[in-house]
Structure formats: C-alpha cells, structure tokens
C-alpha cells in the first residue's frame, strides 16, 4: 500500500529525511547521557596504538538510528503490515546487541554475552523469520548477471539458507564495525542501493520505505560517528544493521546480490576466518591484524583513509550490483 502525503515529496525521501532528522535529535540527548552513565567502549589491548585514545568513548550508540527506524516503521505498519518482519529482525537483533553491550559496560564482562547465549538469541530471531517467510513468500532467489526475472527455487533449503544469510550478515557487519564511520557508511551506501532497486517494482514499496529509513538513520548517526567518533554504535547497532540488510536482501530475493554490494562485509569477515584458520594450521598470521581494516592501519594507512577507500569500494560494488541485476529503468 502506497503512503499518500499531503505535499509533493516522494514517500521514501520523506521517511529518509525524518529518520535522519530524528537521529540528529537523539544524538545530543543520548551521547551526554551514556557518558554520564560511563557506558564507555573498551579498546583491544592488541589493537592499533592510535585506538587507545578511544577508550571510554560512549557505546550503545546504535540506539541513535535503531529508535527512529523502529518508530517510523511501526507507524508505516499501519499502512502496510508487510514491513513487520523487517521490524522484527532489526529490533530483535538490536535488542540482543543491547543486552550484549549492557553486560560489557555495566557488568564489566569484557566479551558481553557468552557466545552460546548470543548465538541462541540470533538463531531464535532468524529461524522465526525464516519459518514465517516459508509460509508467506516463495523460496526463489535472483541469480546475479542473469536479470531480475531469472530466479532459482531453493525449496526445502530455503529456511536454513535464510538463517545462514541473517547470521552471516549480522556477524559480518559486526566485524566491519571497527573504525570510525566504517560500518555506518558502508551500510548507508548499501541501503541506498536497495532503496533505488526497490523503486523498480511496486510490490517492494514497503522494502523501499524501510531501506530508506535505515539509510536516513545511518546518515544521521554518521554525524556523530565519523572520525573522530563521539560515540560508537556497539553491538546494539551493528547487529541491528546486519539483520536489517540481510532481511532486506532476502525479501527482495537478492542475498547473492548482497554478496556483491556488501563486498566489504564479506572481505572483513573472510579476513578474520583466514587469520584464525592460518594461525591454527601453521602458527602464522596472513594479516598484520584482523579484521583487514586493522591490517591497513598497521601498514601505515590513516584511519580516515581506510574508511574513505572502503566507502568508495562499496559505491563501485553497488554500481556492479546494478549491472548484476541488469536493471531497466522505464
């Protein structure tokens, strides 16, 4: 159902602006509050020395965009209830991240939730979403570079595939969130991509709206998270963004396209897996430090340079994504 506005502005542009403005208002409220509560980030002892000064920077900043996205999407649900699964995944993953952050900063448990606790929560949300979709949506996915109408049915593999995509995307975004503005900027670009693609089909109206909300929230958050960051998104934000991006891609039948446009997420996650596997098998490290953004820092790149290069690569990957879909705008 299309949202009718009393003035001449595209609905997705309108919610983008609203989400952006809402996050701009929340930032100056949440940052001092989290600072007073001493909800500060703990920096890795083995990380780049330039990051030591970030110790104590308030975390859990993902609320700056998670709250606007949730509120706006909830209002939009009155027009189109199909947006509810997107809210469920994003808010569900975000709440798990919030609990994880809370344990880190309040209970002073460095790793937050235990691995099995966090994975149980993520799987619970992911499986619920996947089972719901198996009863309400087809199991088709679009094959890159074959056109948007070329799909393959996953059949009984659909549910485990959806779960895999959600768990992988949320962990990949979480890993990417290691430099000021990196995860938020990459996700902003990726969600703008999905917003544009969703404009090509009327049945994706609700996805277009939600993706625009996420993009607007990310842009607003970036004003506080760009170098030098005044706040970090924490797992509250990274898990929510990973869930949102994964769910959007699944509902648009584009998880394989996400591998392309979200190439930075993929490389970041792979760098960690390669590093761990190499060290276990050979006792040697492939990278100076993983994730790979730290490798570039230790190679002499400034933090801002790494972020800008990764943003630029994401823009180029999104252009490749358009070619992979062979979109026809008319």
Curated annotation (Swiss-Prot):
A GO cellular-component term linked to this record: plasma membrane
Superkingdom, taxonomy of origin: Bacteria
TM spans (from-to): 13-33, 58-78, 83-103, 113-133, 152-172, 179-199, 209-229, 231-250, 304-324
Enzyme class: transferase
A Pfam family that the UniProt record links to this protein: Glycos_transf_4
GO biological process, alphabetically ordered: cell division; cell wall organization; peptidoglycan biosynthetic process; regulation of cell shape
Location relative to the cell: Cell membrane
CDD domains: GT_MraY
Cofactor(s), names only, from the UniProt record: Mg(2+)
Matches recorded under InterPro entries: Glycosyl_transferase_4 (IPR000715), PNAcMuramoyl-5peptid_Trfase (IPR003524), PNAcMuramoyl-5peptid_Trfase_CS (IPR018480)
Keyword list, A-Z: Cell cycle, Cell division, Cell membrane, Cell shape, Cell wall biogenesis/degradation, Magnesium, Membrane, Metal-binding, Peptidoglycan synthesis, Transferase, Transmembrane, Transmembrane helix
PROSITE patterns named among the record's database cross-references: MRAY_2
Catalytic activity reported: UDP-N-acetyl-alpha-D-muramoyl-L-alanyl-gamma-D-glutamyl-meso-2,6-diaminopimeloyl-D-alanyl-D-alanine + di-trans,octa-cis-undecaprenyl phosphate = di-trans,octa-cis-undecaprenyl diphospho-N-acetyl-alpha-D-muramoyl-L-alanyl-D-glutamyl-meso-2,6-diaminopimeloyl-D-alanyl-D-alanine + UMP
Enzyme Commission number(s) of this protein: 2.7.8.13
Membrane topology reported for the UniProt record: Multi-pass membrane protein
Pathway: Cell wall biogenesis; peptidoglycan biosynthesis
Gene Ontology molecular function terms on file: metal ion binding; phospho-N-acetylmuramoyl-pentapeptide-transferase activity; UDP-N-acetylmuramoyl-L-alanyl-D-glutamyl-meso-2,6-diaminopimelyl-D-alanyl-D-alanine:undecaprenyl-phosphate transferase activity
Family, similarity comment: Belongs to the glycosyltransferase 4 family. MraY subfamily.
Function recorded in the entry: Catalyzes the initial step of the lipid cycle reactions in the biosynthesis of the cell wall peptidoglycan: transfers peptidoglycan precursor phospho-MurNAc-pentapeptide from UDP-MurNAc-pentapeptide onto the lipid carrier undecaprenyl phosphate, yielding undecaprenyl-pyrophosphoryl-MurNAc-pentapeptide, known as lipid I.
Protein name: Phospho-N-acetylmuramoyl-pentapeptide-transferase
Gene that this sequence comes from: mraY
């Amino acid at each position: 159902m299309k949202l009718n506005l009393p003035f001449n502005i595209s609905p997705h542009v309108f919610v983008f602006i609203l989400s952006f403005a809402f996050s701009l208002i929340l930032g100056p409220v949440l940052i001092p509050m989290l600072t007073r509560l001493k909800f500060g980030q703990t920096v890795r002892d083995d990380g780049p020395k330039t990051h030591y000064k970030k110790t104590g920077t308030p975390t859990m900043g993902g609320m700056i965009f998670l709250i606007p996205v949730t509120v706006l999407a909830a209002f939009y649900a009155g027009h189109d209830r199909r947006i509810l699964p997107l809210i469920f995944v994003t808010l569900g993953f975000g709440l798990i991240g919030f609990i994880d952050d809370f344990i880190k900063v309040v209970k002073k448990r460095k790793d937050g939730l235990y691995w099995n606790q966090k994975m149980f929560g993520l799987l619970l949300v992911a499986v619920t979403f996947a089972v719901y979709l198996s009863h309400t949506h087809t199991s088709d996915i679009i094959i890159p570079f074959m056109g948007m109408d070329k799909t393959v049915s996953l059949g009984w593999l659909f549910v485990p595939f959806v779960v895999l995509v959600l768990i992988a995307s949320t962990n990949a975004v979480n890993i990417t969130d290691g430099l000021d503005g990196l995860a938020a900027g990459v996700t902003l670009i990726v969600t703008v991509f999905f917003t544009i693609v969703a404009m090509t089909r009327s049945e994706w109206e609700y996805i277009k709206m939600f993706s625009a909300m996420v993009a607007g929230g990310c842009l607003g958050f970036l004003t506080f998270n760009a170098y030098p960051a005044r706040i970090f998104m924490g797992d509250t934000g990274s898990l929510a963004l990973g869930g949102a991006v994964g769910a959007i891609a699944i509902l648009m039948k584009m998880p394989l396209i996400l591998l392309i446009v979200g190439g930075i997420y993929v490389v970041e996650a792979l760098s960690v897996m390669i590093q761990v596997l190499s060290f276990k098998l050979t006792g040697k490290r492939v990278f100076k430090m993983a994730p790979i953004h730290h490798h570039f820092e230790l190679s002499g790149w400034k933090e801002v340079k790494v972020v800008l290069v990764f943003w630029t690569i994401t823009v180029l990957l999104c252009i490749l994504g358009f070619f992979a879909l062979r979109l026809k705008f008319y």
